[in-house]
């Protein structure tokens, strides 16, 4: 098989998963670089980079790159492609060629996003792309149009991937295997795919209307022609809120596997509770979107509904957190790097969840909306939730993907540096938000200097951690320490073919005997 047929025309779920992981790692470095530019600008009062426009272009690009080109490709495309077929005993994904197309739509999408920042003054709209700021007056030129096309491509990629994962998870498992006997990671990817399939078309509609408002003189979001900018907010957030659950649900699946494995358990605590908690989170995620819009002026009964509906999500989330703790309980914990990431995830994700409960209160949110309190909240659940889950999964399955082992001491040191860096970066932002520092500004009054400087120092520590990770991965490939024998393979069937597994697995259907 030539290099080109293997890597460009690939129909193999393992190779496509590897492509997604490499793409996500590269995009992650771009996104990290953008975040360091943001923290450098905010490291002290005064201007570093230029005006607020360039600053907001960087903020917008940072969000898009991290969401659409780092977290989603790695979690869904990387871990999802690699593990879902192995975990259900399928020979590959249901639609292997469509799988390849899903991946190859992403590099052009990324290219369009980068192009948007090189024409005119860039798209400095924030990742929400609200009109009228995103309209053709405030953002004349092609920048926002290129960003919209980028989103269209990433969206098509995700929708195709979602169809593929739904079909695979439901239809490609052995007939004797009920859906309630599939591993939790398979469930998490299935639910994530359903969320993508239902939410992305709404985003596509919203940004297409924005495109025609900008270029074809329609007035969907322009009051002068009978439109309403708040309609855009509803369309965007009907996608945007499920999106944040799309980013974290595969992480829930990864953490369930890692916690179970390193606690030495053969199954997670409360499997059915875990499944129904994820289903509940997926359902509730669609009916709370307007909590992002408490400041646009809604009726008191509407605010009351969105406040209480948002708080209800804490219940299934709590079920998951306590089930992870119950899984750990009574286990002989194996203190390998992945469990450190998983424990860090549980602790920090819970803190992020608590600040989320605070923000769910519409009255409090009116004071805190668009302050650094919100930034701190979602970075605790993303920068320490999603990213820690990715690193837990990566350090756990790296031997499966490559056949080599990471250096255990360095991997633990990397956890320590990263843990310090992200907490020092984002914890002070709660204080800034409570003190009223607004988001999306490149400068601030001197009173906010101390916590901003602390936050920026934290970002440099996180950068050190990223460089450490690059070295640790290089060291593993360089030293070529082979995997001897994974433990607990009876209850973790992704490992049964050895490390790494052969190019084709389960070519003939697996024999499944169901325990009565």
From Swiss-Prot:
Tell me the subunit arrangement. Component of the cytochrome c oxidase (complex IV, CIV), a multisubunit enzyme composed of 14 subunits. The complex is composed of a catalytic core of 3 subunits MT-CO1, MT-CO2 and MT-CO3, encoded in the mitochondrial DNA, and 11 supernumerary subunits COX4I, COX5A, COX5B, COX6A, COX6B, COX6C, COX7A, COX7B, COX7C, COX8 and NDUFA4, which are encoded in the nuclear genome.
Q: Which residues cross the membrane?
A: 13-41, 52-87, 96-118, 142-171, 184-213, 229-262, 271-287, 300-328, 337-358, 372-401, 408-434, 448-479
Ligand binding (Mg(2+)): 369-370
Q: What is this protein called?
A: Cytochrome c oxidase subunit 1
Q: In which pathway does it act?
A: Energy metabolism; oxidative phosphorylation
Q: Please write the reaction equations for the catalytic activity of this protein.
A: 4 Fe(II)-[cytochrome c] + O2 + 8 H(+)(in) = 4 Fe(III)-[cytochrome c] + 2 H2O + 4 H(+)(out)
Bilayer topology: Multi-pass membrane protein
What organism is the protein native to? Answer: Struthio camelus (Common ostrich)
Q: Which residues bind heme a3?
A: 377
- Record-annotated residues binding Fe(II)-heme a? 62, 379
Enzyme Commission no: 7.1.1.9
């Amino acid at each position: 098989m030539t290099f080109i047929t293997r890597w460009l025309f690939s129909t193999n779920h393992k190779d496509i998963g590897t492509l997604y992981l490499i793409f996500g790692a590269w995009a992650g470095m771009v996104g990290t670089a953008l975040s360091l530019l943001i923290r450098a600008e905010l490291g002290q009062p005064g201007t570093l980079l230029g005006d607020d426009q360039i600053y907001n272009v960087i903020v917008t690009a940072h969000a898009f790159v991290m969401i659409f080109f780092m977290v989603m490709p790695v979690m869904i495309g990387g871990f999802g492609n690699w593990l879902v077929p192995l975990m259900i005993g399928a020979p590959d994904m249901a639609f292997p060629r469509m799988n390849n197309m899903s991946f190859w739509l992403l590099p052009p999408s990324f290219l369009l996003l980068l192009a948007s920042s090189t024409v005119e003054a860039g798209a400095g709209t924030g990742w929400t792309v609200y009109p009228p700021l995103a309209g053709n007056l405030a953002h004349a030129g092609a920048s926002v149009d290129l960003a919209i096309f980028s989103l269209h491509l990433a969206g098509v990629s995700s929708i195709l991937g979602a169809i593929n994962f739904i079909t695979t998870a439901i239809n490609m498992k052995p007939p004797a295997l009920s859906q309630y006997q599939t591993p939790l990671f398979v469930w998490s990817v299935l639910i994530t795919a359903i969320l993508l399939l239902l939410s992305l078309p709404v985003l596509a509609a919203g940004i297409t209307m924005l495109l025609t408002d900008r270029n074809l003189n329609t007035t969907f979001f322009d009051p002068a022609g009978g439109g309403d900018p708040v309609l855009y907010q509803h369309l965007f957030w009907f996608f945007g809120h499920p999106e944040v659950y799309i980013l974290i649900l595969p992480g829930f699946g990864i953490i369930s596997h890692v916690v179970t494995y390193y606690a030495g358990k053969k199954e997670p605590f409360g499997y059915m509770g875990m499944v129904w908690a994820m289903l509940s989170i997926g359902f509730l995620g669609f009916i709370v979107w307007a909590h992002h819009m408490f400041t646009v002026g809604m009726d008191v009964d509407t605010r009351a509904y969105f406040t209480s509906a948002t708080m209800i999500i804490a219940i299934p989330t709590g079920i998951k957190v306590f089930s992870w703790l119950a899984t750990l309980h009574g286990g002989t914990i194996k203190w390998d790097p992945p469990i450190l990431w998983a424990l860090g995830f549980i602790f920090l994700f819970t803190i992020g969840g608590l600040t989320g409960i605070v923000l769910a209160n519409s009255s409090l949110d009116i004071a805190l909306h668009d302050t650094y309190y919100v930034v701190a909240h979602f970075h605790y659940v993303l920068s320490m939730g999603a990213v820690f889950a990715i690193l837990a999964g990566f350090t756990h399955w790296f031997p499966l993907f490559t056949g080599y082992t990471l250096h255990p001491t360095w991997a633990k040191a990397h956890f320590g540096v990263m843990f310090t860096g992200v907490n020092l970066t984002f914890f002070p932002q709660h204080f800034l938000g409570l003190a009223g520092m607004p988001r999306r500004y490149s400068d601030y009054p001197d009173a906010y200097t101390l916590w901003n400087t602390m936050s920026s120092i934290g970002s440099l520590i996180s950068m050190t951690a990223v460089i450490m990770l690059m070295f640790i991965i290089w060291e593993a490939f360089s030293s070529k320490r082979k995997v001897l024998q994974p433990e607990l393979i009876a209850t973790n069937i992704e490992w049964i073919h050895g490390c790494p597994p052969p190019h084709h697995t389960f070519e003939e259907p697996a024999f499944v005997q169901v325990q009565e």
